[in-house]
UniProtKB/Swiss-Prot annotation:
Residues where Phosphotyrosine is found: 194
UniProt source species: Homo sapiens (Human)
Stretches with biased composition (Basic and acidic residues): 24-52, 623-643
Lineage, broadest ranks: Eukaryota, Metazoa, Chordata, Craniata, Vertebrata
Assembly, per entry: Component of the 19S proteasome regulatory particle complex. The 26S proteasome consists of a 20S core particle (CP) and two 19S regulatory subunits (RP). The regulatory particle is made of a lid composed of 9 subunits, a base containing 6 ATPases and few additional components including PSMD2. Interacts with RPGRIP1L. Interacts with CRY1 in a KDM8-dependent manner.
Sites of N6-acetyllysine modification: 551
Tissue: Found in skeletal muscle, liver, heart, brain, kidney, pancreas, lung and placenta.
Family: Belongs to the proteasome subunit S2 family.
Phosphothreonine PTM sites in chain numbering: 24
Modified residues (N-acetylmethionine): 1
Protein name as annotated: 26S proteasome non-ATPase regulatory subunit 2
SUPFAM superfamilies named among the record's database cross-references: ARM repeat (SSF48371)
One GO CC term on file: proteasome regulatory particle
Pfam families: PC_rep, RPN1_C, RPN1_RPN2_N
């Protein structure tokens, strides 16, 4: 047989025209071809390979002969050869390689065969061969006419190839062609279970996403695969457009519920921002311990569910959701870390380390501006610790070292020190409510609001204390009480509080500042809820204001209130944008841009970012035309109405890029590059906004490249760029105690020792860096960076939008707006409890989180870990896992408050 085979070998090239489309090379002619061919083959093919090749060729020949009785054994043998070739992952299996030139001939043979079993059998073999030919989806074509035997028998590579062709074919068929889609669906129903069983869950998901049939996943998933599938689906969410992203989340949520993983399902319902679903998941869970864990998660996210009183352990659940214990748990952590000792601003400034010939930057005369800075620093550093050395002992002495509005902020800082401690805190603030100074009184009102931030209390002390002052004759009193209510009820969407506040906007006595703060407070309370009353009242206020009033710098808070009301709501803002069309420029584009970016906050929406970049690059033509006009006139205009500059909305667009991209790593990286360009080549309005955008994209995450950029621009020629850069450094490092940043800020303090405004910013940044002595964070993302807290984003935006006009707002009289940051303050700790909610110290490994999406097996989720005993602090990008098998966590993400259960199999 071998002889015969060898004689026939030269015949092979004559079939090449048929196989040519598959990519065989052109051959030289006649005799040289035979000689060259023989030589090459001698070198290339080992004896075994040669035998295999000849055998395969003979089988193909047989199929071409007239004797049909030989077909079946020949096909059987071909199939055996193809299957038994153990494939190395890097090269094409030998039988497929040798059969490739005969592909065309096999197709001809197939066409000429009589219908029946053999013909279908041949189709199977051609389908497998088609993998090696880059052609017209023939792998799929022949599969569909083949014998329909099990996919698995042909191996993984074949299944993967087929899946790709199914997806392409599906997209070319219209919805109308349902009949043609049927056989494809049948194939998909074979492919998906195969992938699930062979560690290729992500390929199954990809296929179903391509053909938009994600719901089919649920029935094929088993206990072992669901976690991986859901992880893959949720990590795809950032990369698919509306409405597919919510379809993926809902699919993953369905899978979690199928396996009774309630905490994970709840997390996805919060991502979807679907409150009915949240309530449904919470109430359908019958395990009280898991319900308590979910209550902790809701409390952290700032969501409160009104439970019916007959729910088991109603009081406990309500208390957990209300964050009543937040303060005592936080103080327990502080005691554990031994950081209860109150700090004074000088401990933070470390003026003794400055080698200054004229004494340190802090040793100049007591100026009101520096005392104000110290009030903020003192508040930030001792936030939530309940004691300090300036205010809690004998506060009056310190308060009177401040002037006017400074007193307001100084008094309010007491609220920050007593943060979350509703019962103990209000009694300490109470005495200042009787002060003869309106500013101190107003500050004390704001402090009452701050103390209640993020904590619910059924007695509603904040509402009771502050409601009388909302329409007070003095606008100063209004400011403190309204902003206080905004912070105390942020995210609650409480109708009673809103009905109290909304009339203030239209009140004739309200200054523009009060109207602005009211819009802000209402936006914070109704954050992300699309509340109709808030929308209509703010829109009405904007319509009623004259053009000059809208040029007031505080007018920017009106559209911000609108934006916060629609935070993350996407297309729901079309009507508002249409309503704003009647407002005159430049306020219109400012308001439009601001509402638009809020609606897509954290969505990672690429198209929106592109629109914003267009806005950023708009200004150049108009600038050149303006330059011919009288420059002096332009200067006067700048002085009078800086915020009404035509480019004001560009600053918002820059912030918007950060706001949209911050939810997702790749988008954030791309935004960083863009900001680099804007800083170098942008207009002044743009450059002032870039540091703020950098702060937003990296809150409480002191990345060196961002710090270096900010450090460079903290010496910028444009003072507003340098103010914003310095403050941004504080936000980027907030609550981290980052030593490198602290050193940078000390150098800046020396550099700006003679410039009170810059020094004020440096002090603020120093206070933020040591926020809560390094135990708090301002980052709006939690639960492994999956969930964005809308209340936190509202707080950050309030501050950053105000910084767009830093000179008139923050360095002017409205520095109290910095307390917006309170809404974003959260302890960055991990505390473990047993089922009775008693603290339970266990050892945990804390390390850098590793992305394990789509990896096979059970890869490690953290790297470079250290083992600690809870309670512990978690830095940005760190993840914790239990280091003992004695307990099992009720939720897979160890962050915040976690309940542990005894592992029933531990003693075995």
């Amino acid at each position: 047989m071998e002889e015969g085979g060898r004689d026939k070998a030269p015949v092979q090239p004559q079939q090449s025209p048929a196989a040519a489309p598959g990519g065989t090379d052109e051959k030289p002619s006649g005799k040289e071809r035979r000689d060259a061919g023989d030589k090459d083959k001698e070198q290339e093919l080992s004896e075994e390979d040669k035998q295999l090749q000849d055998e395969l060729e003979m089988l193909v020949e047989r199929l071409g002969e007239k004797d049909t009785s030989l077909y079946r054994p020949a096909l059987e043998e071909l199939r055996r050869q193809i299957r038994s070739s153990t494939t190395s992952m890097t090269s094409v299996p030998k039988p497929l390689k040798f059969l490739r030139p005969h592909y065309g001939k096999l197709k001809e043979i197939y066409e000429n065969m009589a219908p029946g079993e053999n013909k279908r059998f041949a189709a199977d073999i051609i389908s497998v061969l088609a993998m090696t030919m880059s052609g017209e989806r023939e792998c799929l074509k022949y599969r569909l006419v083949g014998s329909q035997e099990e996919l698995a028998s042909w191996g993984h590579e074949y299944v993967r190839h087929l899946a790709g062709e199914v997806a392409k074919e599906w997209q070319e068929l219209d919805d109308a062609e349902k009949v043609q889609r049927e056989p494809l669906l049948t194939l998909v129903k074979e492919i998906v279970p195969y992938n699930m069983a062979h560690n290729a869950e992500h390929e199954a998901c990809d296929l179903l996403m391509e053909i938009e049939q994600v719901d089919m996943l649920e029935k094929d998933i088993d206990e072992n695969a669901y976690a991986k599938v859901c992880l893959y689906l949720t990590s795809c969410v950032n990369y698919v457009p509306e409405p597919e992203n919510s379809a993926l989340l809902r699919c993953a949520l369905g899978v979690f519920r199928k396996f009774s993983r309630f905490p994970e399902a709840l997390r996805l319902a919060l991502m979807l921002n679907d409150m009915e679903l949240v309530e449904d998941i919470f109430t359908s869970c019958k395990d009280v311990v898991v319900q308590k864990q979910m209550a902790f998660m809701l409390g952290r996210h700032g969501v409160f569910l009104e439970l019916s009183e007959d729910v088991e352990e109603y009081e406990d659940l309500t208390e957990i959701m209300s964050n009543v214990q937040l303060n005592s748990n936080f103080l327990a952590l502080a005691r554990e870390l031994d950081i209860m000792e109150p700090k004074v601003p000088d401990d933070i400034y470390k003026t003794h380390l400055e080698n200054n010939r004229f004494g340190g930057s802090g040793s100049q005369v007591d100026s009101a501006r520096m005392n104000l800075a110290s009030s903020f620093v003192n508040g930030f550093v001792n936030a939530a610790f309940g004691q300090d050395k300036l205010l809690t002992d004998d506060g009056n002495k310190w308060l009177y070292k401040n002037k006017d509005h400074g007193m307001l902020s100084a008094a309010a800082s007491l609220g920050m020190i007593l943060l979350w401690d509703v019962d103990g805190g209000l009694t300490q603030i109470d005495k200042y409510l009787y002060s003869s100074e309106d500013y101190i009184k107003s500050g004390a009102l704001l402090a009452c609001g701050i103390v209640n931030s993020g904590v619910r209390n059924e007695c509603d002390p904040a509402l009771a204390l502050l409601s009388d002052y909302v329409l007070h004759n003095s606008n100063t009193m209004r400011l403190g009480s309204i902003f206080g209510l905004g912070l105390a009820y942020a995210g609650s969407n409480r109708e009673d509080v809103l009905t109290l506040l909304l009339p203030v906007m239209g009140d004739s006595k309200s200054s523009m500042e009060v109207a602005g703060v009211t819009a802000l407070a209402c936006g914070m309370i109704a954050v992300g809820s699309c509340n109709g009353d808030v929308t209509s009242t703010i829109l009405q206020t904007i319509m009623e204001k004259s053009e000059t009033e809208l040029k007031d710098t505080y007018a920017r808070w009106l559209p911000l209130g609108l934006g916060l009301n629609h935070l993350g709501k996407g297309e729901a803002i079309e009507a508002i944008l249409a309503a704003l069309e009647v407002v005159s420029e430049p306020f219109r584009s400012f308001a439009n841009t601001l509402v638009d970016v809020c609606a897509y906050a954290g969505s990672g929406n690429v198209l929106k970012v592109q629109q914003l970049l267009h806005i950023c690059s708009e200004h150049f033509d108009s600038k050149e035309k303006e330059e011919d006009k009288d420059k002096k006139e332009k200067k006067d205009k700048d002085k009078k109405e800086a915020p009404a500059d035509m480019g004001a909305h560009q600053g918002v667009a820059v912030l918007g890029i950060a706001l949209i991209a911050m939810g997702e790593e790749i988008g954030a990286e791309m935004a960083l590059r863009t900001f680099g360009h804007l800083l170098r080549y942008g207009e002044p309005t743009l450059r002032r906004a870039v540091p703020l955008a950098l702060a937003l994209i990296s809150v409480s995450n002191p990345r060196l490249n961002i710090l270096d950029t900010l450090s460079k621009f903290s010496h910028d020629a444009d003072p507003e760029v340098s103010y914003n850069s310095i403050f941004a450094m504080g936000m980027v490092g907030s609550g981290t105690n980052n030593a490198r940043l602290a050193a940078m800020l000390r150098q800046l303090a020396q550099y700006h020792a003679k410039d009170p405004n810059n020094l004020f910013m440096v002090r603020l940044a120093q206070g933020l860096t040591h926020l809560g002595k390094g135990t708090l964070t301002l980052c709006p993302y939690h639960s492994d960076r999956q969930l964005m807290s809308q209340v936190a984003v509202a707080g950050l935006l309030t501050v950053l939008v105000s910084f767009l006009d830093v000179r008139n707002i923050i360095l002017g009289k409205s520095h109290y707006v910095l307390y917006g940051l309170v809404a974003a303050m959260q302890p960055r700790m991990l505390v473990t409890f047993d089922e009775e909610l008693r603290p339970l110290p266990v050892s945990v490994r804390v390390g850098q989180a590793v992305d394990v999406v789509g990896q096979a097996g059970k890869p490690k989720t953290i790297t470079g870990f250290q083992t600690h005993t809870t309670p512990v602090l978690l830095a940005h990008g760190e993840r914790a896992e239990l280091a003992t098998e004695e307990f099992l966590p009720v939720t897979p993400i160890l962050e915040g408050f976690v309940i542990l259960r005894k592992n029933p199999n531990y003693d075995l």
